[in-house]
Amino acid sequence: MAEIKNYTLNFGPQHPAAHGVLRLVLELDGEVIQRADPHIGLLHRATEKLAESKTFIQSVPYMDRLDYVSMMVNEHGYVLAIEKLLGIEVPERAQYIRVLFDEITRVLNHLMWIGAHALDVGAMAVFLYAFREREDLMDVYEAVSGARMHAAYYRPGGVYRDLPDAMPQYKASKIRNEKALAKMNEARSGSVLDFIDDFFTRFPKCVDEYETLLTDNRIWKQRLVGIGVVSPERALQMGLTGPMLRGSGIAWDLRKKQPYEVYDRMDFDVPVGVNGDCYDRYLVRVEEMRQSIRIAKQCIEWLRKNPGPVMTDNHKVAPPSRVGMKTNMEDLIHHFKLFTEGFHVPEGEAYAAVEHPKGEFGIYLVSDGANKPYRLKIRAPGFAHLASLDEMARGHMIADAVTIIGTQDIVFGEIDR
């Protein structure tokens, strides 16, 4: 009788469903996965080491490039750690703006996830729908920071600037007639806050559209139900966080359990799954988008009523105003010193964690009293999730490995960092 042998297959790093640079070495028995060995490091850029040779403020843009789908939430963890060490108070308005943009980023992340996950599984349409909404939110990023993705908007002590009074508008071109232009600029006639408000008023309908396409879709359920099941106990043991943990039925959300900024004033629910499979994790993330709408609406309401400063008044940390810089020599010198030498952070260590769209994103910061971090450790949620891939994929088909990678919502910027 012929000897039965398992064969080994390389999945990625060029595979379209590998989400970037994932290389999986799969050991297969026929089409059934016996072992999945993820090989990481193909996107390693030594972020932690680079941060040691840059001033505290110069490392903010590095944070955007970790999980490059959830840019501002990465910055949030980093600036929180610096603020802990400095012991400075962030103005209330800046805290509300941060919470608002955390939720905008959460929606951006989940839109990317639902589009890519559905595309991997074979549902093309949702991808196009999701990117239609992402476009509007990217424009909000651009309005406040000047960049569509890598914003560097959060700064130690607050945010870069207050929300602008005008939303950038589409300009006339060869391909846009007056009628189309007027329709596109309809929601853009007011302030950025008006535009965000309008977006979150329209957005529940969009989420309903995604659910119409997927939630009760027979093929979608066949591909997701019962795949990649993780029990609550194993989820905790493997260090899963965020929707991966909540999908297994554990209501752990840092916004509720360890509130930072003004999350303790927000009224929202934490969605949890029942079965711990890919379908439950899908439902959790869709519901998270709906909860983000609730939080964003509360922030918008507060921001409309309460103007105020968006940066701390501690001049050792906060740069002078642009107007002051152009008229006052001292302000110019102060600005130059702040952006060349940077500020010195007291000796000590701090850990700050935020509820990132993918899980718990933590920054462990050690300062030796200099103007640069002595050590910066990044706790990326995706790292623990990828480590659990082997256990989740065992006994499933190759096609299911694609579903499991999609449900983990993996981005390699933060895993390889």
Swiss-Prot record:
GO CC term, one of those recorded: plasma membrane
**Predominant cellular place of this UniProt entry's protein:** membrane
Q: Which residues form the signal peptide?
A: none
Enzyme Commission number(s) of this protein: 7.1.1.-
- What name does the UniProt record give this protein? NADH-quinone oxidoreductase subunit D
Gene3D superfamilies (alphabetical): Cytochrome-c3 Hydrogenase, chain B
| Family classification | Belongs to the complex I 49 kDa subunit family.
Note the PROSITE patterns from the entry. COMPLEX1_49K
Catalysed reactions listed for this entry = a quinone + NADH + 5 H(+)(in) = a quinol + NAD(+) + 4 H(+)(out)
Q: How does it assemble?
A: NDH-1 is composed of 14 different subunits. Subunits NuoB, C, D, E, F, and G constitute the peripheral sector of the complex.
One family name in Pfam for this protein: Complex1_49kDa
Localization (cell): Cell inner membrane
How this chain sits in the membrane, per its record, is:
Peripheral membrane protein
The species is Burkholderia cenocepacia (strain HI2424)
| The protein's role, per its UniProt record | NDH-1 shuttles electrons from NADH, via FMN and iron-sulfur (Fe-S) centers, to quinones in the respiratory chain. The immediate electron acceptor for the enzyme in this species is believed to be ubiquinone. Couples the redox reaction to proton translocation (for every two electrons transferred, four hydrogen ions are translocated across the cytoplasmic membrane), and thus conserves the redox energy in a proton gradient.
- Molecular-function annotations in GO: NAD binding; NADH:ubiquinone reductase (non-electrogenic) activity; quinone binding
InterPro entries in the cross-refs: NADH_Q_OxRdtase_suD, NADH_UbQ_OxRdtase_49kDa_CS, NDH1_su_D/H, NiFe-Hase_large
- Keywords attached to this entry: Cell inner membrane, Cell membrane, Membrane, NAD, Quinone, Translocase, Transport, Ubiquinone
